[in-house]
Amino acid sequence: NAQGDMKLSLKAYRKDNGLPTGIGGDDKAGIFICLQLLERFDNIKAFFPVAEEIGCKGSLKADEEFFQDVGYAIQFDSTENDTMSLSLMGTQLFEYESDFFKKSKGIILEHGITEWKHHPYTDAMVLSQKFSFACFNFAAGYYKYHTSEEYVVVEDVVNSTNLGESLIKELGEEHYQYKPQSNSKYSWF
């Protein structure tokens, strides 16, 4: 993992020649985490948009009606086991001095998320811009993404799932209004 520890990992190999191939962990791990959270809560929704890696096409066309009762979004599409996105393409995902972040910060740190980064785009940015709510994007336990050496660390996926559960319990069903200031160079609206 990111700390150099040996952990149980999932990796894919080609059937025809036994060589490593990409596992698609950057998508699959995040989807798995969301499915686990859907089993733990009866008051949350999941949104699985298409074509994130070619311009967040699904999020750009997200149905406003679906998001009318959404108070915030948590995405699991950051690398490794200790990262989260502070901003995506220069667009901040939440206000640092907000109740949203103040309630969450300790929980985030307790789960080992200590590398807070400025990342390229992912769906949380588009949803925040489009629907004016605060978002997080957390590590999903995948490493060496988009390469034949990609792998997923099981313990890291479990930690991210537990992080999501703790945050949902703490943040509850409140609406955390946030309209990001879009960097005009990157704004999609």
Language-model region placement:
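A gly/proline- and charged-residue-enriched helix-loop-helix capping module
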Residues: 13-21
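Catalytic-loop motifs flanking and including active-site residues across diverse enzymes
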Residues: 26-33, 100, 123, 156, ...
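An extended, acidic, His-containing surface patch that forms the Zn2+-binding/catalytic region
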Residues: 87-131, 181
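Zn-dependent metallopeptidase/amidohydrolase metal-coordination segment
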Residues: 115-160
